[in-house]
């Protein structure tokens, strides 16, 4: 095992919206180190959000992330030859990480033509408490509720 835990690196706020959350979304969407493409996808999606909702895109984005954040998740714990899915509380940092991961994964799975439209629509849906990423959070919470009996195995 490792001697020391790797320290968390702090991301810089993005130049347009001055938000660390947007920078993290850009990093999450980026493939093969192509940051410019990832930035254009995010900012174009934000422009589409502004056109469709007539609201500030950063507010819609923050509301979407807030709606996707899970409060409980399941971890598999092996006890006496049986595997139990133990519900545990999610730290604030991991809530954001999971929310961004789910948002972008479910945006990629949508049926629209280009990623900017997919992402914009997924963000709008999530801010209205619908869409694949919100359903993922609901499913996670449902599973945690179903396995509440194993909560005493928490560590």
Curated annotation (Swiss-Prot):
GO molecular function annotation: rRNA binding; structural constituent of ribosome; tRNA binding
Keywords of the record: Ribonucleoprotein, Ribosomal protein, RNA-binding, rRNA-binding, tRNA-binding
A Pfam family reported for this protein in Swiss-Prot or TrEMBL: Ribosomal_S7
CDD domains reported in the protein's UniProt record: uS7_Bacteria (cd14869)
Stored InterPro entries: Ribosomal_uS7, Ribosomal_uS7_bac/org-type, Ribosomal_uS7_CS, Ribosomal_uS7_dom, Ribosomal_uS7_dom_sf
Entry's Gene Ontology BP terms: translation
Origin superkingdom: Bacteria
GO cellular component: small ribosomal subunit
Function noted in UniProt: One of the primary rRNA binding proteins, it binds directly to 16S rRNA where it nucleates assembly of the head domain of the 30S subunit. Is located at the subunit interface close to the decoding center, probably blocks exit of the E-site tRNA.
Stated family: Belongs to the universal ribosomal protein uS7 family.
Subunit structure: Part of the 30S ribosomal subunit. Contacts proteins S9 and S11.
Identification of the protein by name: Small ribosomal subunit protein uS7
Classification of source organism: Bacteria, Bacillati, Mycoplasmatota, Mollicutes, Mycoplasmataceae
């Amino acid at each position: 095992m490792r001697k020391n835990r790797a320290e968390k690196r702090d991301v810089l706020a993005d130049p347009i919206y001055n938000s660390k959350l947007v920078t993290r979304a850009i990093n999450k969407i980026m493939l093969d180190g192509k940051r410019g493409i990832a930035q254009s996808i995010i900012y174009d999606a934000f422009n589409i959000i502004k056109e469709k909702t007539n609201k500030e895109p950063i507010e819609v984005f923050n509301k979407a992330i807030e709606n996707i954040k899970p409060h409980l998740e399941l971890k598999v714990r092996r006890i006496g030859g049986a595997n139990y899915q133990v519900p545990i509380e999610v730290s604030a940092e991991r809530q954001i990480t999971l929310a961004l991961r789910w948002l972008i994964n479910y945006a990629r799975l949508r049926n629209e033509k280009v990623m900017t439209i997919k992402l914009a629509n997924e963000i709008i849906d999530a801010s209205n408490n619908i869409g694949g990423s919100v359903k993922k959070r609901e499913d996670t919470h449902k599973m945690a509720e179903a396995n509440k009996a194993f909560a005493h195995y928490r560590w």
